[in-house]
């Protein structure tokens, strides 16, 4: 599915700037990303369904397929060179002005059962089940006919949230709450 939308309809100039900047950076690296999480939900609900989410967010979650952790380090270096600030506390997190950017790697970097283990200690584990399938069913969104981003579909977001809930339902109810959108 493909959509063409106006940045004015997104209603968040900083988000559009961030998406444009990410697109330029990832194109230069010859890498693909797609938007997941609440921002994907909000864009799709507003553009396709015509309703807005009750919860606003100032964070952006993206997924990238990488073969190994060295590639993630290369992505990190390019983003920092392009003006993103790397979090000192969270391995997946970057900052762009007021936005938090979380990058979820998947693909060959995952180990058995589609689990990633953040280096070097590998003590933080995260399930990335279904990420390939969600990408293959993503929506390509052209913004102002200037650049395009891939966004997880609503059913893809539900699959990712369901897996996250199964993975961490004893720790948090956030994923179940997010599935109720």
Place the predicted regions along the sequence by residue.
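Compositionally biased terminal segments of proteins
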Residues: 1-181
